[in-house]
A protein has these predicted regions:
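Acidic/polar, low-complexity intrinsically disordered N-terminal segments immediately downstream
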Residues: 1-139, 149, 167
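Buried hydrophobic residues that stabilize the cores of well-folded domains
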Residues: 56, 71, 115-118, 141-145, ...
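Beta-sheet ligand-binding and adhesion/scaffold domains
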Residues: 73-112, 120-122, 200-272
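N-terminal glycine/threonine-rich, aromatic-flanked beta-hairpin/loop signature
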Residues: 23, 30-66, 127-245
């Protein structure tokens, strides 16, 4: 009798906020940092629950998914999906011992999904660095030759890969080489994704990794930044707060299989 009541009533105990040590997050096959993120489960029966992902999906700070519940041997599983803009978010998770383990995927259906050749030449890359801060704006002449030498002098092609799983990737082929090199493994491990928010293409970085990235930037170019009177805080002002992520907004112009990325046309400074 007791067993019957506990097994049929346990679903009511699922309804709570799972965060910190009570939640595990995996995007596809990659473990995601949980700081600043949470999963809220609200079970309405032993078969149904709503699952809310907070600060987990770049497209929206809070994504609610209607999920089907099943119980076996004290473990509840939940599955469901929801569409946010042009992104289909799917979850498949378990709750056992008060811990929610959530595996989720993003599947982008946008027309920008694909492998794009970066259009070579002066118009290929633009940066939104007309900030009104003269120290940042004065960096443009320094950046132009640096990026020009880095990219076009040493590679024969640059591709921006925008796969449907939402992981941002760039690959390039060094002159004389027969194979491409890329940053896909790094962007996957560091959860560097892309999304479309309010029609704007954004490259997004998990806030938990921004500290690491800014530290590396400080180590690599801190003296140059300091000499120019620029702080990491000034750079951060160029980013958009997307909840669990920071986004760098860019416009994307497609011409056949080639693409050009640029900032708001009113604020464009060609970098190359």
């Amino acid at each position: 009798d007791d067993d019957d009541s506990s097994s049929s009533g346990n679903w009511q105990d699922l309804s709570k906020t799972y965060e910190g040590k009570s939640v595990n997050l995996v995007m596809g096959e990659v473990t995601i940092p949980v700081d600043g993120k949470s999963v809220v489960i609200a079970a309405s029966s032993a078969e149904k629950a709503s699952v809310t992902l907070n600060n987990i999906i770049p497209e929206n700070k809070s994504v609610v998914i209607d999920a089907a519940l099943k119980e076996a041997d004290g473990t509840y599983t939940f599955t469901g999906e929801s569409t946010v803009g042009d992104c289909v978010v799917s979850v498949n998770g378990t709750v056992k011992g008060g811990v929610a383990s959530v595996v989720y995927t993003r599947k982008l259906t946008s027309s920008i999904v694909g492998n794009w050749s970066l259009k070579a030449g002066a118009g290929a890359i633009y940066a939104n660095i007309v900030t009104g801060n003269s120290t940042i704006d004065n960096l443009v002449p320094m950046i132009k030759p640096a990026i020009g030498n880095l990219i076009w002098g040493k590679v024969s092609a640059v591709n921006v890969n925008l796969p449907e799983d939402g992981i941002f990737d760039v690959s390039w082929r060094p002159i004389g080489a027969s194979e491409d090199k890329g940053i896909g493994e790094i962007t996957k491990m560091a959860s560097i994704q892309y999304c479309v928010v309010d029609g704007k293409f954004m490259v997004v970085v998990d806030k938990n990794y921004v500290t690491v990235l800014t530290t590396l930037l400080q180590q690599a170019a801190g003296d140059k930044l300091e000499a120019a009177g620029i702080s990491i805080d000034e750079i951060m002002k160029l980013l958009v707060d997307l909840g669990g992520y920071y986004g760098l907004p860019l416009n994307m112009k497609v011409d056949g299989s080639e693409a050009t990325f640029y900032a708001d046309k009113d604020l464009i400074v060609p970098v190359l």
